[in-house]
C-alpha cells in the first residue's frame, strides 16, 4: 500500500492506498500474537487497537479536508493544493497535523502507536516485520510531506478565490479532528492502557 501511495498524483488516491499500509501495521500485532508470545499478547494487541483508534481520527480528518477542497472545486492533485495554506490556514494546519501523525513522526500520536507495535513484534521474534514496518513508515513520510509542502510552500497554480467562502460544517469538523489528534498525544498513555486492558480481557 505504501509503495502504491508513493506513486499517486491525486491526494485522495494516495490516502486510499496508504490505508492499506496502516492495516498492515495492525496485522503486525496479529502476527506477533499468533507467534504465541503470551507475555506480550495484551501489550501488542493493545497497541494494534490503539493504532487503529488514532488512525481513525487522523484519516477521518484528512478525508474531511479533501472533501472541503473538492467543495471549493480546487482540484485533486498535489499541485492543485498549492498555496491553500495561505487562504485557509487553520484547516491547513490541521491537515499538516494529520499528515505528520499518519507518517508517524515523533511527538505525534501515530509515532507512539507504531513504536509500541514494532517493539512488541521485536519481543515476539518478528524483528524483520518491525524492520519492514519501519522502512515503509519512512517511505510514507515522503508522500505525506508532499501534501504539507504543497499547502504551505508552493505557489498557487490556479485561482483560489473560492476559498474565501468556507463551508462552516466541514471547516469546523476538520479543525475539531485536528485538535483531537493533537490531544491524543498527552492522552496516549490512558488510551494504550485502556486498549491493553481490553486486549487482556480477550486473552484472559
Q: Which residues make up each language-model segment?
A:
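Active-site proximal loops enriched in glycine and acidic residues that flank catalytic Cys/His/Asp
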Residues: 18-19, 52-54, 133, 145, ...
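Hydrophobic, aromatic-rich alpha-helical transmembrane segments
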Residues: 44-48, 52, 127, 131, ...
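Predominantly late transmembrane helices and immediately cytosolic-facing juxtamembrane segments
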Residues: 56-65, 69, 74, 128-163
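Transmembrane helix interruption/hinge and helix-loop junction motifs
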Residues: 123-127, 185-187
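Re-entrant/interfacial helical elements at transmembrane boundaries that shape
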Residues: 16-19, 111-120, 152, 190-197
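Hydrophobic transmembrane alpha-helices and their helix-loop junctions in integral membrane proteins
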Residues: 1-109, 119-122, 138-140
Amino acid at each position: 500500500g505504501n509503495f502504491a501511495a508513493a506513486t499517486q498524483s491525486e491526494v485522495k488516491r494516495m490516502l486510499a492506498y496508504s490505508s492499506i499500509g496502516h492495516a498492515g501495521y495492525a496485522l503486525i500485532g496479529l502476527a506477533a500474537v499468533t507467534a504465541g508470545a503470551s507475555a506480550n499478547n495484551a501489550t501488542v494487541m493493545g497497541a494494534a487497537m490503539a493504532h487503529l483508534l488514532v488512525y481513525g481520527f487522523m484519516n477521518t480528518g484528512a478525508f474531511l479536508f479533501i472533501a472541503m477542497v473538492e467543495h471549493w472545486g480546487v482540484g485533486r492533485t498535489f499541485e492543485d493544493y498549492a498555496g491553500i495554506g495561505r487562504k485557509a490556514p487553520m484547516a491547513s494546519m490541521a491537515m499538516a497535523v494529520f499528515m505528520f501523525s499518519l507518517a508517524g513522526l515523533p511527538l505525534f500520536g501515530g509515532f507512539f502507536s507504531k513504536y509500541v507495535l514494532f517493539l512488541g513484534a521485536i519481543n515476539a521474534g518478528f524483528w524483520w516485520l518491525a524492520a519492514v514496518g519501519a522502512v515503509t513508515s519512512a517511505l510514507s513520510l515522503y508522500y505525506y510531506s508532499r501534501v504539507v509542502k504543497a499547502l504551505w510552500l508552493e505557489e498557487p497554480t490556479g485561482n483560489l478565490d473560492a476559498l474565501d467562502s468556507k463551508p462552516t460544517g466541514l471547516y469546523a469538523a476538520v479543525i475539531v479532528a485536528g485538535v483531537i489528534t493533537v490531544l491524543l498525544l498527552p492522552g496516549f498513555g490512558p488510551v494504550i492502557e485502556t486498549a491493553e486492558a481490553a486486549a487482556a480481557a480477550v486473552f484472559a
